[in-house]
Amino acid sequence: EAVRNALGEDVRIMTDANGRWRIPQNIETLSCLKDYDVTWIEEPLWHDDVAGHCRLAEIIETPIALGEMLYSLAHFNEFISSGGVKYVQPDATRLGGITEALDVCDLAYEHELPVTPHAGDMAQTQIHMSIVHQSIELLEFIPWITHCFEEPLKINSGYFEYPQMPGAGTTIKNECMQEFGRKV
């Protein structure tokens, strides 16, 4: 209630269980949130539980969003074709690139499902996808990593400004590579 009152009616509220809840906990929590116009519950169950997500989708009114932990078009197809997801969230950096992520967007579009790419650490990559694919409805913004980029993403009146540089549209700062990088 406090969040809805603070944000007002014009701002969407999304919840994220990060795959940590079981079906009863989702039902209980979402029943408490039903009066606050929650857009979705993200990753309500463990990320590879297709049957559980389908069962939960039949029980709850809140749409399910997921995809950041899925690593192939085939896995997305399982969730989409079985009805276990209503907002599709591919992450190009985890799917192995933009091509596979766009294939997921195509699949979602065929099933009339909106796409909201998972921003993760490289939201710039997802922005480029939004330029070319009609299924992308929303983009996430991760403000706590903007200091890591020479040309961080900019938002103007609630909309991203598209990067003008080639590739991912930015350059990662060396100090962040040293801070967050790891040897492999």
Residue ranges and their predicted role:
Residues F149-V184:
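C-terminal extensions of enzymes
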Residues I13-D16, K86-D91, I172:
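Short acidic catalytic loops
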Residues E1-I59:
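Metal-dependent enolase-superfamily TIM-barrel catalytic cores that perform enediolate-based chemistry
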